[in-house]
Amino acid sequence: MFNLQKRINGNNEDGRYLETRIAVRDKLLAQELQQLETALRDQKQKLWHLEVPSTSCLHELELTVTPQEGIYRGGKFRFKITVPPEYNNVPPVVKCLTKVWHPNINEDGSICLSILRQNSLDQYGWRPTRNLTDVVHGLVSLFNDLMDFNDALNIQAAQMWSQNRESFNHRVREYISRYC
């Protein structure tokens, strides 16, 4: 009998669902990595670099974002992107590996970014039509488009940004010199 929860967890009668999902994910990733390679070459400014540490694990990627302007200029922010078997039905899992003072990135590296949410309250959440290029652009924009922190993950950073911009900028520069 068909059991939805078992199916979601990757279990079914013949045990092949998870294998099929991994095959689909890897095929999508191969296509998307080619698109990202082209996008990387076409950059006017080198704002990001993507690496696949192991060719046998296409689903584990490392992204380095290097802002060229703004308060995060000069920093090198590393992210680990893990693409689950259920991709593209669920978003990749992204963790910031570089300690950074940012309203949307907390001290343990968790990230608040609509595109990374399965169930987002706005229209920018994850959908199967999204891809890794969208994720990369979203992560790059975290360091360029400081706009709205009503949904901040690092509350202290958001409050400092809105109440004392000079102190916020100083703390950002301090973190960049210490951790980047």
Swiss-Prot record:
Pathway: Protein modification; protein neddylation
Cytoplasm listed as a keyword: yes
Subcellular location: Cytoplasm
Active site positions: C112 (glycyl thioester intermediate)
MF GO annotations: ATP binding; NEDD8 conjugating enzyme activity; NEDD8 transferase activity
GO CC terms in record: cytoplasm
Gene null: resulting phenotype: Worms either arrest during embryonic development, or show vulval eversion at the L4 stage and burst at the vulva during the L4-to-adult molt. Those who survive to the adult stage display severe abnormalities in the structure of alae. RNAi-mediated knockdown results in severe male tail tip defects.
Alphabetized SUPFAM superfamilies for the sequence: UBC-like
Any matching Pfam family: UQ_con
Cross-referenced PANTHER family: UBIQUITIN-CONJUGATING ENZYME E2
Catalysis performed (reactions): [E1 NEDD8-activating enzyme]-S-[NEDD8 protein]-yl-L-cysteine + [E2 NEDD8-conjugating enzyme]-L-cysteine = [E1 NEDD8-activating enzyme]-L-cysteine + [E2 NEDD8-conjugating enzyme]-S-[NEDD8-protein]-yl-L-cysteine
Function: Accepts the ubiquitin-like protein NEDD8 from the uba-3-ula-1 E1 complex and catalyzes its covalent attachment to other proteins. Plays a role in male tail tip morphogenesis.
Enzyme class, spelled out: transferase
Annotated ranges, domain UBC core: 24-180
Similarity annotation: Belongs to the ubiquitin-conjugating enzyme family. UBC12 subfamily.
Record protein name field: NEDD8-conjugating enzyme ubc-12
Assigned EC number: 2.3.2.34
Biological process annotations from GO: negative regulation of DNA damage response, signal transduction by p53 class mediator; positive regulation of nematode male tail tip morphogenesis; protein neddylation
